[in-house]
Regions:
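Secondary-structure boundary/capping motif
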Residues: 12-22, 81, 107, 117, ...
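Core segments of cupin and vicinal oxygen chelate
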Residues: 11-60
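Short amphipathic alpha-helices in soluble, non-transmembrane regions
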Residues: 21-24, 95-99
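Conserved beta-strand in the GNAT
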Residues: 63-66, 128-129
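Residue-level structural signal for beta-strand termini and adjacent loop
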Residues: 36, 67-68, 133
């Protein structure tokens, strides 16, 4: 029986732009990437990254894979949105300020009963959500 999500990988159109977005917002530590200057004979070990990066986001991993030329659409089969957990409402307030500071449009904080959500999109239009419980 499964006990949690190990990792999620998002396909993106531009790895540099996506890295700047996710690292600028979340400052997650990089868990796995091919080191700069890796000799060609050793690069095959990193083939599973497909030129991307994997971040440690707490108890799970989130990867970015630069292969897509399509745009995200939650109305097609596949991913609807990615929701990331925060500890409480104060972190959500800080997130609003950070999104505003970086000029990232968002839907404002919404009360959904058991907590609050903040919805926004990444540069590839992937729907993202931050969730904060009412009681930390």
């Amino acid at each position: 029986m499964t006990k949690s999500i190990n990792h999620i990988r998002l396909t993106v159109t531009d790895i540099d732009r996506s890295r700047a977005f996710y690292e600028g917002l979340f400052n997650w530590p990089v868990a796995i990437e091919m080191p700069a200057g890796t000799p060609p004979e050793e690069q095959g070990r990193y083939g599973f990254l497909y030129g991307g990066v994997i971040y440690n986001i707490g108890h799970s991993l989130l990867g970015l894979r630069p292969v897509s030329t399509d745009t995200f659409d939650e109305n097609r089969t596949g991913l609807d949105h990615l929701s990331l957990a925060l500890q409480g409402p104060a972190e959500l307030t800080s997130a609003v300020a950070l999104l505003d500071e970086q000029g990232i449009p968002h839907g404002g904080v919404k009360d959904i009963g058991n907590g609050f959500i903040l919805e926004f999109r990444d540069p590839d239009n992937i729907a993202l959500e931050l969730f904060a419980p009412k009681e930390p």
